[in-house]
A protein has these predicted regions:
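Short acidic/polar active-site loop segments enriched in Thr and Asp
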Residues: 13, 59, 114, 169-171, ...
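Generic structural signal for helix capping and beta-alpha/helix-loop junctions
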Residues: 24, 56, 101, 125, ...
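Bacterial carbohydrate/catabolite-sensing allosteric modules
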Residues: 41, 82-87, 133-137, 141-329
Length: 329
């Protein structure tokens, strides 16, 4: 059944049917009752997306992220969803791992979102949507868009200071793929690592490997580090998931953590506490919630003014770090 058929049966215009079924004013009670009866007689169910579009708002927010299956992203999504649900908004998730697949998804949905949350992706992805689509970035600071982030460089320096103070000098970095955006979270963390190692006079480019922010990538990267003539005594992983993969490979290689190799992660996922992982804690759910609040505020105001929020991190020292054996002896 269509809205036109309901209008014909009730003897009113399509616009009147739309207003009556959406509960809007300027519809006589008798007319509203007639429209509702006609809709029931025809078993008509209005399309919620069409109704939303007719009002000028879809009540849908898009969230774009490179790895939608990561625990880090899941925490951000959870925080954002909680805020959005209370305001009656749905959340639609895009993956940006492939520019082609993102463009295809965005092309199908660009008219169906009121705003975008961009997690660890550059503001250029906003061009896939309508020019006036509101957007907020998470993890990547932008002058043009509102953002929520942590001080990734400082957090990385803090983690490195811990390892250096323990006496480690052969410290490897399980990084992510090179980014085109110098202000992206992985790039800022990498820069913090490089600065700490250079200041300590022990930077070695062969100790920086790409773990791809995945379990498989981190495992392969760890094996390549262990194959070096002078392997590292400590690993700093830019995510807890990569740190967990590294620990698994170390144990497979009969190396003890932290007695033989120390490991530091980044995020402080729930699993990190269970495994006793030393890691940088960042408030992932808070970042997601804050991004949703900023975005909804921008949508309501419609002024396009950007706002930036910075959240604190702290190093949680547990049981995967210790002084290297050379220092202990």
């Amino acid at each position: 059944m269509t809205i036109e058929q309901v209008a014909q049966r009730a003897g009113v215009s399509v616009a009147t049917v739309s207003r009556a079924l959406r509960g809007l004013e300027n519809v006589a009670d008798s007319t509203r009752a007639r429209v509702q009866q006609a809709a029931m007689d025809l078993n008509y169910r209005p399309d919620p997306h069409a109704a939303r579009l007719a009002s000028g708002h879809t009540k849908t927010i898009g969230l774009a992220a490179p790895l939608v299956d990561s625990r880090y992203i899941a925490q951000i999504v959870s925080g954002a969803e909680e805020v959005l649900a209370k305001r009656g908004f749905d959340l639609f998730i895009f993956t940006t791992r492939s520019q082609r697949s993102f463009s295809s998804s965005a092309g199908n949905r660009h008219l169906l979102v009121d705003g975008m949350i961009l997690v660890d992706v550059g503001p250029d992805f906003r061009s896939q949507f309508a020019v006036d689509t509101a957007a907020v970035t998470v993890g990547l600071q932008s002058n043009d868009l509102s953002s929520v982030s942590i001080d990734n460089g400082a957090a990385s320096l803090h983690a490195m200071a811990h390892l250096l103070e323990l006496g480690h000098r052969r410290i490897a970095l399980l990084a992510g793929p090179e980014s085109n955006h110098p202000s992206s979270a992985p790039q800022l963390r990498r820069r913090g690592y490089e600065q700490a190692m250079q200041d300590a006079g022990c930077f070695d480019a062969e100790l920086v490997v790409d773990g791809a922010f995945t379990l498989t990538g981190a495992a392969e990267a760890t094996r390549s580090l262990l194959a070096l003539a002078n392997p590292p005594t400590a690993l700093f992983a830019l995510s807890d998931e990569m740190a967990i993969a590294a620990i698994s490979v170390l144990r497979e290689s009969d190396l003890r953590v932290p007695e033989d190799v120390s490991v530091v992660g980044f995020d402080d996922l729930d699993l990190a506490e269970v495994l006793g992982l030393t890691t940088v804690r960042q408030p992932m759910r808070q970042l997601g919630a804050a991004s949703a609040r900023l975005l909804l505020g921008e949508i309501e105001r419609g002024d396009g003014e950007s706002e930036h929020q910075m959240f604190e991190t702290n190093l949680v020292v547990r049981h995967t770090t210790a002084a290297p054996r050379s220092v202990e002896s």
